[in-house]
Amino acid sequence: MNREMLMLIDAISREKNVERDVVLGAVELALASATKKLYKGEVDIRVAMDPDTGAYETFRRWLVVPDEAGLQNPDAEELLTDARDELADIEEGDFIEKPVESVPIGRIGAMAAKQVIL
């Protein structure tokens, strides 16, 4: 499926005269959106797709916020002191990322990318 997705990305890019990276980014956003629906709350999801192979990884992210600010969105934020328990050199504004299960591309990626481009 990954190779087929890359062929579809190339076809949409040519058909709509849009740079390939823009279409690839749209597919990543579509997959992230589909993954978010698997979670309760306002989670932050990032998908990274290899532009050469079509392989992709999905990550759940937490924004590191200052302790005094408190957590406004516990599903997508982590306090600085707690974050430093995991990563000593992390700073405010950085993200903690942990891999999560990726949703299959299927039609979701293709259709959502097309909608973003249109």
Regions found by a protein language model. Give the residues of each.
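Charged, low-complexity terminal tails
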Residues: 1-118
